[in-house]
Each structure stands twice: as C-alpha cells, then as structure tokens.
Amino acid sequence: DDVESRGLGDVYKRQSMDILISSNLERLLFDLSGENDAEVRGYMEALAAQGRYQVSDKIRAGLDAAFWAGSCGEEDTAATIGRYYREYGYLIDTHTAVAANVMEQYRAATGDTAPTVFVSTASPYKFCDSVLKAIGEAPAGDGVELLDQLHAVTGTAVPRRLAALRGKQRRFDLSCEKQAMD
C-alpha cells in the first residue's frame, strides 16, 4: 500500500511477501521511469541498504494512473476467510482473502461493480493453521494432522500432493535467512 499511497517501498516482514525484491516490480519501475536503469538500480540499492526507497514523482504519477491499492492485515484476512466460508461455503487461502478484501475496499471507494475474477494460486491447505482459526476452529496438532482436521471440518479435499506426505519422514531441519541464500 505504501508504494501506491506514498510512493514508498519498505521491506515487508512477512515470509513470502517481500514483493519489493521482485523482477516484475523492477520491470514496472523501469518502464515507468522511462527505461532509466540507473534510477531503478538506485531504488534497489536503497532498499538493500536502508530497507526502503521513495520513487520519483514521475513514477508515482504512473502508479497512480495504473493502479488502485489497499491493505489487509492479519485480522481482516482471517475475517475475510471466515466470511467467505460462512456466506458462500467457499474455503479460501490467506492470499486469496487479501485479494478479496482489497477488492471489496476498491468497490466501496470507487463504486465499481464490474465482475471480478480471483486467480487463487495457493491452497487453504497450505495455511491450515490460519484457515482453521479463521473459520472458528482451534488447530489440533501440526503437519498432516492439520490437513486431516481441515478436511474433517470443511469436507474439502486435501490436495493430492499434500496428502502424499502422510507417513513421510522429515528430510531437512535446516533454515537460513534469505540474505544467506547465495
């Protein structure tokens, strides 16, 4: 939301959500800067050194003309998952919930009622703990146990590849910071 509303880019703290280090965003900034590679490189260097950057007025104007932005925190994400499940009988993942919530914000702000399609790229089963809590269930267990619990509560099918994890031994216990991944 900061990129759109104030022209700022900040490193996002949530895992898998650091969209500021993205070749797609770099390409967008490159296009909006008039293909000024030095300017875009400066933004990426500022992001690496200071954790943020502020785009030029020219880029800001291009962003304002092309995009509408909103934000959706964890509480609103959970509320959206729960509401979609209760009202529509449809189980959505955390990423889709953010999209749905921001779409609703957009409609409220603009009056636009055009039909909308969400392309969900994640499964609710990838986020069992969060999804269970969002639909009012206390997660019981971890790993495959949560897959089974979400299935038992909702009747939705566990994705085949996740179901195939039953009985498998954990192969890796290593983790590292993303900056250490060379």
Predicted segments, located by residue:
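Buried hydrophobic packing segments
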Residues: 1, 24, 28-31, 99-106
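Single conserved hydrophobic/aromatic residue that forms the stacking wall/gate
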Residues: 2-8, 12
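C-terminal amphipathic alpha-helical segment
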Residues: 16, 21-33, 37-40
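Active-site-adjacent helical/loop segments in soluble small-molecule enzymes
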Residues: 34-113, 177
